[in-house]
Amino acid sequence: MARWQDVFESEPNFAAAVQKVFEAHKHKTIATLRADGSPRISALEVEFRGGEVVFGMMPRSFKAKDLRRDPRTELHSASVDSSEDDPMTWPGDARMSGRAVEITDPVERLRFIDDPSATYPFFVLDIHRVVRVHLDGDPPHLMVRIWEPGRPLRDAIAD
């Protein structure tokens, strides 16, 4: 299981840039899989706590049901537009994919949740991939930077 701390320890500048993009806005997007295998996109809040990427949700939410059935998921930061005059003002976006691991043990939950009586579904992300997309160069081009456990950070230029 790769934790956020693993990303931060191996590539601190990359991790800081990704975290900055995620923390710039309260609401993010999560992709889950419905029972029939079709994708579902939902809104949620994500936090970085205790070296983990963590998120909770309403007890009977569809996304919680999806993740309990199939934990594969992807989280996406908010995406905002650049200035019309200067595309380089675009802050970029980021995403993380992996498996959502539900934390049900009351003692373990206290590492992340302040209210011991909270019963809502709560997950940490077992990270398989982190991607940061931003503009770079002159003329600007889309730069895709990818982190995966045990592999060197790599860049791909999108044409």
Predicted regions and their residues:
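Charged, gly/pro-rich active-site loop segments
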Residues: 1-13, 80, 84-159
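Short, conserved active-site entrance elements at the starts or edges of catalytic domains
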Residues: 5-34
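Proline-centered flexible-loop/turn and helix-kink motifs
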Residues: 12-13, 69-71
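Structural motif corresponding to alpha-helix initiation and N-cap regions
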Residues: 15, 60-61
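Short alpha-helical functional segments enriched in proximate histidine and acidic residues
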Residues: 21, 74, 132
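A generic structural signal for nonpolar/aromatic side chains embedded in well-ordered alpha-helices
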Residues: 21-22, 67, 112
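Short solvent-exposed loop/turn micro-motifs enriched in small/polar/acidic residues
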Residues: 23-25, 38-39, 60, 87, ...
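Short beta-strand segments
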Residues: 25-59, 65-67, 74-79
